[in-house]
């Protein structure tokens, strides 16, 4: 649903800017002692639909023999004040016995300069508002002209508490094409937070294109 919304919205805004990344991904996960190792694809979409609306989406799809991995995260931010935004966030992970989906609504504080940016956000599950929470931060570092490092951390307090950490590096090869390197780790625990259910990581490499 989130992906469809983004594509429809992108078409609607003729002045939109988009950075699309397509990469080869290597997946390594463990569910209660059972290991899953395989490969697949990783899609990244980042852009601005209007001066007040920005979005970010990451999708991973892989296969481990006859088991399929689907992992996606996305957010849309609507700026209501210069540094304050309303955030619609969604995530999904499906692998073997683990199937978790979260849709949250919240607020964020955003501060950006030419070489540094930080976003701090917090929200609550739409279906259980005030019961389950999502919170985290995202930092953008302009290492040098034409290169950028993004670090992010997110915790989703739901039926299975999920913690995600990401590191993504983009190096511009030309005006429109860039090298895309990334690492993402995911860990989910049971409802009590006492035992790890899923733990693993995704490493990917590919290219980005700016429209």
Regions found by a protein language model. Name each.
Residues 78, 169-173, 185, 198-211:
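Outer-membrane beta-barrel "beta-signal"
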Residues 24-30, 59-63, 90-96, 111-113, ...:
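Transmembrane beta-strands of outer-membrane beta-barrel pores
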Residues 16-20, 51-57, 82-88, 113-120, ...:
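Repeated loop/turn-to-beta-strand initiation elements of outer-membrane beta-barrel proteins
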Residues 14-64, 122, 210:
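Short glycine/proline- and aromatic-enriched beta-strand/turn motifs that initiate or cap beta-hairpins
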Residues 47, 78, 82, 109-111, ...:
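Residue-level signature of outer-membrane beta-barrel architecture
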Residues 35-41, 68-72, 99-105, 129-135, ...:
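Residues that define the transmembrane beta-barrel architecture of outer-membrane proteins
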Residues 100-158:
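Detector for outer-membrane/organellar transmembrane beta-barrel domains
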């Amino acid at each position: 649903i989130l992906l469809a919304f983004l594509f429809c919205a992108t078409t609607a805004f003729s002045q939109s800017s988009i950075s699309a990344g397509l990469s080869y991904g290597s997946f390594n996960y463990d569910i209660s002692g059972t290991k899953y190792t395989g490969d697949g694809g990783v899609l990244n979409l980042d852009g601005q639909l209007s001066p007040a609306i920005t979005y970010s989406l990451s999708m991973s799809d892989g296969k481990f023999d006859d088991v399929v991995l689907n992992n996606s995260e996305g957010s849309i931010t609507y700026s209501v004040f210069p540094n304050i935004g309303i955030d619609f966030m969604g995530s999904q992970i499906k692998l073997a016995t683990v199937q978790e989906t979260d849709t949250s609504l919240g607020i964020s504080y955003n501060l950006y300069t030419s070489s540094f940016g930080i976003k701090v956000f917090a929200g609550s599950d739409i279906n259980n508002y005030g019961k389950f929470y999502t919170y985290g931060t995202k930092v953008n570092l302009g290492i040098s002209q034409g290169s950028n490092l993004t670090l992010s951390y997110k915790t989703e307090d739901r039926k299975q508490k999920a913690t995600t950490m990401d590191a993504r590096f983009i190096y511009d090869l030309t005006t429109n094409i860039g090298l895309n390197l990334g690492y993402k780790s995911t860990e989910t625990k049971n409802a009590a937070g006492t035992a790890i259910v899923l733990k693993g990581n995704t490493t990917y490499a590919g290219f980005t294109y700016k429209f």
